[in-house]
């Protein structure tokens, strides 16, 4: 699967290239060129996450390794469902995204993202450094994301 820039003039990249590039060189965001579909039923959150998102990896990470990365990413969440959907009133539901290690919704993405960076960089024999500035809660999530 190729990733394309939202501004349209950057070169197409594969998963690893888009992951490590962050922003496209034309200032756009890299997004998937196509959107595959997946069916999941009754699996754990980590297993569903692996099944749904692995097609976006385009074979750069074997599925068994990818599933293990997902399981590790969500193992520190305080709720067995990771992000339970709770009925708060008849026909009114709330998706609880605060059960991660920093109690912020960003944990849902960053716990996996950090592991993806670690895997790809190790596979390439490279190291990375992320420098960031924040005035909010993002810093604590990144710090706990194993990047």
Where are these regions (language model features)?
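PLP-dependent amino-acid enzyme catalytic core
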Residues: 1-144
């Amino acid at each position: 699967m190729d990733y394309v820039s939202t501004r349209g003039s950057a070169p197409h990249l594969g998963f690893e290239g888009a992951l490590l590039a962050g922003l496209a060189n034309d200032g756009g965001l890299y997004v998937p060129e196509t959107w595959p579909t997946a069916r999941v039923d009754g699996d754990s959150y980590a297993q569903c996450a692996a099944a749904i998102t692995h097609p976006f990896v385009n074979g750069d990470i074997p599925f068994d390794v990818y599933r293990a990365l997902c399981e590790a990413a969500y193992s520190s969440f305080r709720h067995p469902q990771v992000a339970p959907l709770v009925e708060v009133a008849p026909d009114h539901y709330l998706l609880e995204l605060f059960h991660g290690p920093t109690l912020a919704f960003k944990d849902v993405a960053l716990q996996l993202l950090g592991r993806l960076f670690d895997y790809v960089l190790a596979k390439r024999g490279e190291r990375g450094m992320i420098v960031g500035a924040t005035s909010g809660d993002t810093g604590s999530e990144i710090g706990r994301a194993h990047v």
